Amino acid sequence: MVEEETITVEGDYETLIPIDEYLAAGVHIGTQQKTSDMMKYIYRVRTDGLYVLDVQATDKRIRLAGKFLANYEPSKILVVSARQYGQRPATMFAKAVGARANVGRFIPNTLTNPHFAGYIEPDVLLVTDPAGDGQAVKEAVDIGIPVVALCDTNNMTSNVDLVIPTNNKGRKALTLIYWLLARQVLRERGEEDRFKYTVSDFEMEF
């Protein structure tokens, strides 16, 4: 039997989308492991041992990340996703905001070796998972650019400058988070009228 989830929102805080939409996409569903780094974003632990993320914290962090990323030249934002379910959402995020996407295997030296054929010089890195995208994160740290990361309950965040707490493994969760973040970046730039995409446009196809 699946445990039904109810999450309350403090006071009159208004989320970017209804809480039910976050829950339907499974954004709140964490793992059965937690790190001390992610404790502050955990809402509760279910009877089956699964940690549940606080979607209000997720919502606030999407707002913060949108404001942060909107300060950068679009072409200087690099979004990376080794994880399959994050590849289409990451690519669509890049298309929507004018960023650059690097999906699939991240080739070492992409950010650190000017003599490498695929060398690029971003000013900020956005990753689907700081563990799965660890090579990109390491190189970002080496060259001194900030890292924004979608982080699940089991992630370490020591090399992450801005955490977005979310289920970073589920197809629907990654679709919704990248869609929301793209919309928020354009909103912060005053360009929301350019955002013509639906959530399904961001979803991985089979």
From Swiss-Prot:
Family, as annotated: Belongs to the universal ribosomal protein uS2 family.
One Gene Ontology cellular component annotation held by this UniProt entry: small ribosomal subunit
Pfam families referenced in this protein's UniProt entry, alphabetically: Ribosomal_S2
Species, as recorded: Methanothrix thermoacetophila (strain DSM 6194 / JCM 14653 / NBRC 101360 / PT) (Methanosaeta thermophila)
GO MF assignments: structural constituent of ribosome
Cysteines joined through disulfide linkages: none
Keyword Ribonucleoprotein included in the entry's annotation: yes
Record-given protein name: Small ribosomal subunit protein uS2
InterPro entries: Ribosomal_uS2, Ribosomal_uS2_arc, Ribosomal_uS2_CS, Ribosomal_uS2_euk/arc, Ribosomal_uS2_flav_dom_sf
Domain of life from the UniProt record: Archaea
